[in-house]
Amino acid sequence: MALSAEDRALVRALWKKLGSNVGVYATEALERTFLAFPATKTYFSHLDLSPGSAQVRAHGQKVADALSLAVERLDDLPRALSALSHLHACQLRVDPANFPAPGPLPAGDPRPALPRRLQPGAAGVAGQVPEPRDLCAGFRVP
């Protein structure tokens, strides 16, 4: 899904506001994922998953760095995220079906308009994670 110039500008403006806190927010999102979806912990059994652990913060920073790369290269997300997609699909054997993209906000959602306007950007990034069978010969979900 191609993003409009307005969508790209909106995503970049938000990212600029997040500034140096992107790693903190990504870590918090990771911790919330572990709480809301405990099954995701199986992919991180080698880490200390206690809130605020150095290992969770380090992985949160990796997520933040990947998202920052995506924001820098919004015009070419497939190429920007291809190495990351290959790593997760072929080496780590992560099934993208376990990590669905966030759905749209309901029409009457009382939250501010900004998150709704950013949905195309989030969907654009999530949509760049190809099916493992498209990347890796013989892929099977463990």
Swiss-Prot record:
GO terms for cellular component: blood microparticle; haptoglobin-hemoglobin complex; hemoglobin complex. The keyword DNA damage does not apply. Residues 2-142 form the Globin domain. Heme b binds at H59, H88. Signal peptide: none annotated. GO terms for biological process: hydrogen peroxide catabolic process. The keyword NAD does not apply. Keywords: Heme, Iron, Metal-binding, Oxygen transport, Transport. GO terms for molecular function: haptoglobin binding; heme binding; metal ion binding; organic acid binding; oxygen binding; oxygen carrier activity; peroxidase activity. Belongs to the globin family. This is Hemoglobin subunit theta-1. It comes from Papio anubis.
